[in-house]
Amino acid sequence: MLPLSQLSRRERHYRYVQEARVKLLLTSAGVKNTSIKNALVDLLGKPIADSSALCIPTAMYGHPRVGPGAGAWQFISGQSENPMCELGWKSLGVLELTALPSIDEERWIPLVRDTDVLLASGGDALYLCHWMRESGLVDLLPSLSETVWVGLSAGSMVMTPRIGEDFVGWKPPSGDDSTLGIVNFSICPHLAQEGMPGNSMAEAEQWAAGIAGPAYAIDDETAIRVVDGTVDVISEGQWKRFPS
């Protein structure tokens, strides 16, 4: 088997989809309740207070209503309404993907490998996907078997095969809505009651009809956990699975 360095980008894509072993906690709005927090601790195998974290705000820069600006600072500093960085980590740093191509790999790869959890903010999933590829972070996924990826909205959607046209904002060079495909289902976050901010069930059903694959709609009290290909839903709220 050829090493990743000798493969084309397309070949590397299929390799890391097949080999990715990072543990996933895919949320709509962060660690919003006790059930999701308990699932996180279970994935870590130790208390949050004994765990190191790196937050990834990159997705925010691609979304016109989120960043750059105050939103990124609120996320990093733990002042947002979506609990991620303020959970009481042993250590917390920032991993800015747009900066990584301009610095030596030795400056950041060992740091990522030694970190317990990666916290990916919401924002634009296609922008985040682009920079996960450009930075080389996605190529590390097969070696991060002990690492937990906690996604928030776009930070969760980036792990899916595609996000659907309804969620396309920033457009990648490919022009399509495909994302990393680490999992085999798509996600519609922010499921909400009719008339409330977010995506209604009717809107989620219409979105799912255009996905042409398995999908989940999850509200802000729900997360999807994926470990070694096994998927389960942790929820104190509302969610729905759409078969392919």
What is each model feature region?
Residues 9-21:
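Short, Lys/Arg-enriched N-terminal segments with co-localized hydrophobic residues
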Residues 60-127, 131:
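Portal/gating segments that form or line small-molecule/metal binding sites
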Residues 2-7:
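Extreme N-terminal basic, low-complexity initiation segments
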Residues 120-196:
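Class I SAM-dependent methyltransferase SAM-binding "motif I" and its flanking Rossmann-like core
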Residues 21-50, 59-75, 164-244:
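C-terminal and late-domain segments of enzyme folds
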Residues 21, 48-53, 115, 146:
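A general structural motif
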